[in-house]
Amino acid sequence: MPWIISVALLCTFSSSAICLPEPLTFQVLTVCNFGFFFVVLPGDHLKVCPQGSTCCSQEMEEKYTQQSKHDFRNAVTELSNHLQATFNSRYKKFDEFFKELLENSEKSLNDMFVRTYGRLYMQNSGLFKDLFDELKRYYVGGSVNLEETLNDFWARLLERMFQLVNPQYHFTDEYLECVSKDTEQLKPFGDVPRKLKLQVTRAFVAARTFAQGLAVARDVIARVSAVNPTPQGAQALLKMMYCPYCRGLVAVKPCYNYCFNVMRGCLANQGDLDTEWNNFIESMLMVAERLEGPFNIESVMDPIDVKISDAIMNMQENSMQVSQKVFHGCGQPKTLAQSRPARSVPESGFSARFRPYNPEERPTTAAGTSLDRLVTDVKEKLKQARKFWSSLPSNVCNDEKMSAGSVNEDNCWNGSNKSRVGRALRVILSKTKAGYHPPIKP
């Protein structure tokens, strides 16, 4: 009876040092709510937790070891998942925007050329489809040489145009090959091919690099945040998170500086990644700046139909001079055996002009934003991701589930007992060299 009275008083006035039955302890139940008690044992059997009086069996210590690793992984994953989701959503948004931009550009060109050139364009539409197919293939990572692709497009276009403006002649494949070889020297399309090649090449390289960079960031975060503590790290995590339970201190959380010290050790490899990670972030910001400036893929692709049409007009206007240069270099072609009336240039469908492209017009796609706004948003997220890995230990310990917090050091677990860590540890940590990872043992 005196024992029962003593226990009742203990439950009434102080439950902080009371042990629970093993199953309830593992589930972190409140002792006074259930009235269960566990006999305090000597801790000689414990391998990690303090070996004084304890209410943990060896089996419980092993269970807590697994639970502490689980909690650690969850804490890191919870923080990294947000950043990973940010990069993933921005990658999907940019990818959707870019692909739709290409689709819209191709459709705009097709609609314009059907209205203007009619049957002549439709008979040669495969040439333009091939160009856009190659641009799309490059973006998704295909082995495409953009300069060669554009050179080939203009050479093939010259072959088709040359036959249309000289319908009275018969041209063999060998003759047309001779014509296309001199495309750069003849400059039948004016300066449009040179300018467009420069604009398309640098814009597509920047766009693909940016999209791939966002995907790489997402994947790196997923891999690096999949932490697996070393045996020494697992012991430190157990000692920090669950050894106080073996003392009956189920409501006492680890001291912040103690938590920070352990996390720096357990996340040392992630911290070492920070320099390369920050370099990567800065490189992505540089690409973003280019996308906002002269490498803006939107300002290149939106007017591409007008630019190609202008090139065709230039060829039309200078067809006689171009033809004479070709005849001089490749020889005089044979006339058609059976004569037929030559169609005039206006009838051939090359006479239409289009309104000039206004660079101030920045249409949005179905993705819901222009490239400028999309890149601005990504830049902000990139800046926020700086020093993510080196900040991970402090961010983990800032979680109220992981530590008592930096302002509550009078009532926290320091690795051996409930006490204040004190100013000494803070001084030591503040003087720690940047390249040194403190030991994960307290």
Residue ranges and their predicted role:
Residues 2-69, 76, 275-442:
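Eukaryotic terminal intrinsically disordered regions
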Residues 2-3, 14-249, 253-256, 262-291, ...:
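N-terminal ectodomain recognition module in secreted, GPI-anchored, and membrane glycoproteins
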